[in-house]
Amino acid sequence: MGLLQKLIKTYDVMADKYAGVYIDGMREPLAPVSHALQNAQIEITIDSNGCFIDAAAVPKKENRTLIPVSLKSANRTSHASPHPFAEQLEYLSGFDEERQKSYLEQLMDWDESAYGNVFTHAVHTYVEKNSIIHDLYKAEVLESENEEDMSKKKMQSTAYKKCLVRWKIKDVLTGEVIETWKSKEMFRCYIAYYNMVIAKESKTGLCMLTGENVPLTELHAKNIFPLQSGAKLVSANDKTEYTFRGTFVKNAEDLLTIGYEASQKSHNMLRWLLNNFGIIAGNEMFVYWNPNGRYVPSPFEDRKEGEEIISDRETLYRSIFESTEDSLSSTDCIVIAAFKAMTTGRLALAYYSETPGNDFVAKLEKWKESFTGAKWIPSIYMVSKYAYGSERNERIEIESGIYTKKIEELLWCKLYGHPISESLKNALVTKASSPYRAFHYRQQCSYNNCLWCSIQLCPL
C-alpha cells in the first residue's frame, strides 16, 4: 500500500472525530471532503431571513476558515469560478456583475436542491440585495464604498475586492448565532450536494487508489505543503509536454486515474499532518504517523532521562493520537515520509518508509540502549548539525541538502539497524578534537554537545 492509500485510510479513521473541528494549539483543522482552508478577512452576521446585523474584521490569529469548494474554484487562477458559499468581495459586491451572477446561480442551485438549508437561503437572499459594500462601509469595516477603491485600499495587506467573507447566521426564532465555517450541518449538506454534482459532471471509472468504480478527477489539491503554498503532489494535467508521453500508454487516463473522494481524503489528510505535525529539516519536511490513529514515539527528537513530553508539538501529537506505545503491534504500520518542493508548483516525495509498529518501537529501544549509561540521548538533528555544520553568529548552521541527507541516513541507522557511516564518525571526531577551530571559544555549550555526540556514537 502506497502513500496516498495510507493517507486515505488515516482519513477514514480520523475524520469522524477531527474533520471540521478547530482545536486549541493546532495550526489548522482537518478539512472535510469538498472543503478547503483559506484566510478570511471579513466576518458578516445576518439573520436567517437574510437581513444584515453586523460585520467585523477577522483578527489574523483567528482567520483560518473552512469553506466549501468545487473542483474548479479550488483550482482557479484568474478565471471566474466562484466558491459556493464563503467568497471574496469581488464575487459578492455587484461591481463585477458577471462574477456576482455566477456566484448567485451556483448558490441558488445548492439552496434549491434537497441539500439546501437555512444558511444557504439566508446568504443568497442577502447577497441578492446588492448592499454588502454599503453595509461594510456603515459598519466601519471598509474605509470607502467607491468601486475604484476596491483595488487600491487594503485590509490586512489584501485588496478590498480580494477579502474573503465568512458568514454567521442568527436564527430569528431562537436567537442562536451559528458560525457556518464550524457547522457540522453545513459540512454534511455541502458534501452531499457536491457528491450529487460530481456524479453528474465527472467521468466514472476505476480509482487506482481504492479499486472502486467512482467519479474521477484530474484536478487535485494545492496548498498542502507549508514551505511552498502552491505546490501540488499530483499535478500533471499537461498532455503535450513531458508527462506520460514515451511510456507504454497513449492516454493519461491509461496511466493513472484517481477518484474525486480519494483525492480529497488523501490531500486533506496530508495537509493536516504536515501543517500540524510536520518537522522541518533543511528544505524538506518530515512527518510520521500510524494510519490507525495510534500514538507513535518520535524517531527524531532527543530525550532526557525521566522526561515524558519534550515539546509543544509532541504534547499536541499525544493529545490527538490517543494511545500508548505498548499498543503498537506487527499489524500497526508506522509511516515516515519527507516532502520537498521541487518548484513553486511541484511537490516531491523525497523519502518514504513503512515499518511494523512492534519492530519500530523495538528499534527505538535498541538505539536508546546503545547509549550506555547516558542520561541524555542526542537527536538525529543534533548529530547531523554538529558533524557537518559550522558556527555562524553564535549558531550552528548546516547546508540544507547535506542536512536532509544526513537526517535520512541516521533514520536508516536508527530504524533499520544500519551502521553509522565512517564519514559521519570522522566528522564528529574531527570537530570534537579541534574545538578552537570548530567553535567560538564562548560557545562552550556547542562544543560540549559535539563532544557528547562523538563519545556516544564513536566509542573507542
What are these regions, as identified by a protein language model?
Residues 1-193, 214-460:
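Extended alpha-helical scaffolding segments
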